[in-house]
């Protein structure tokens, strides 16, 4: 069984190492990467990400809604393409299935 919380933690570590400016779009901006797991805002975001992954796996994810919310935060296709690459690395590291289709669904609404 996949530990999606661990996948998500590795995803965000990978994403913020590759694109540190992305962390500024979150409520935990300026928090050291090594301290993220102890930050309440990060825990909330990571939990939402795990919930979305579970919904995507179950076929009930609201890709249009997620895309719409992110557009309002000036997050577009470039960021999601970069996130897709980081998510693929995190999934691979944990033996998890590739979730590229979930990102593609979001991208189709941007």
UniProtKB/Swiss-Prot annotation:
Signal peptide positions on this chain: none
Cited InterPro entries: Globin, Globin-like_sf, Globin/Proto, Mb-like_M
Pfam families reported for this sequence: Globin
Iron is among the record's keywords: yes
Globin domain mapped to chain residues: 2-110
GO-annotated molecular function: heme binding; metal ion binding; oxygen binding; oxygen carrier activity
Regions crossing the membrane: none
Residues reported to bind heme: 70
Record keyword Heme present: yes
CDD domains reported in the protein's UniProt record: Mb-like
Key words of the record: Heme, Iron, Metal-binding, Oxygen transport, Transport
Stated role: Acts as an oxygen store capable of sustaining neuronal activity in an anoxic environment for 5 to 30 minutes.
Assembly: Homotetramer. Self-associates in the deoxy state. Seems to dissociate upon oxygenation.
Entry's family note: Belongs to the globin family.
Record protein name field: Neural hemoglobin
Organism: Cerebratulus lacteus (Milky ribbon worm)
């Amino acid at each position: 069984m996949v530990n999606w919380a661990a996948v998500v933690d590795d995803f965000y570590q990978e994403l913020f190492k590759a694109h540190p400016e992305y962390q500024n779009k979150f409520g935990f901006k300026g928090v050291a990467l090594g301290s993220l797991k102890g930050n309440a805002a990060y825990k909330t975001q990571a939990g939402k990400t795990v919930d979305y992954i579970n919904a995507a796996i179950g076929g009930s994810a609201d890709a249009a809604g997620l895309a719409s919310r992110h557009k309002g935060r000036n997050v577009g296709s470039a960021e999601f393409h970069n996130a897709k690459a980081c998510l693929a690395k995190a999934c691979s590291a944990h033996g998890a299935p590739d979730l590229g289709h979930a990102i593609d669904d979001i991208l189709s609404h941007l």
